[in-house]
Amino acid sequence: MTNPRETIPPGNSGEETIEEAFDWLDRTVEAINREAVNHLPRELIFQVWQRSWRYWHDEQGMSRSYTKYRYLCLMQKAVFMHFKKGCTCRGEGHGPGGWRSGPPPPPPPGLV
């Protein structure tokens, strides 16, 4: 995953469109998922996605993009805390499925 500080989110120059902002959000969510799956259990990623969707989209009535944004914030915090606690898997990762043995569950819907 590239350094997130190097990525300037859309909207800072005033020339971006809403569609570009949504594309940026989708790319960033996919990138954090690709990194997180190497460090966190797939069940955790799946549950955070499902619960974010259920709460923000279904219960609160927020848009899809807002739900993805809230999910992105949670996953960034989870990956940050994992690294802060001394992750030694920066190069190789924990392998597919994080710490779980056996076949991995399906990835979050729409984020394959």
From Swiss-Prot:
Stretches the record annotates as Binds to human NUP153: 61-80
Disordered as annotated region, ranges: 92-112
Cross-referenced Gene3D superfamilies: 1.20.5.4730
Alphabetical UniProt keywords: AIDS, Host nucleus, Host-virus interaction, Inhibition of host innate immune response by virus, Viral immunoevasion, Virion
CC per GO annotation: host cell nucleus; virion component
Biased composition (Pro residues): 102-112
Assembly behavior: Interacts with the P6 region of unprocessed GAG. Interacts with host VPRBP/DCAF1, leading to change substrate specificity of the CUL4A-DDB1 E3 ligase complex. Interacts with host NUP153.
Annotated family: Belongs to the lentivirus VPX protein family.
Protein's UniProt name: Protein Vpx
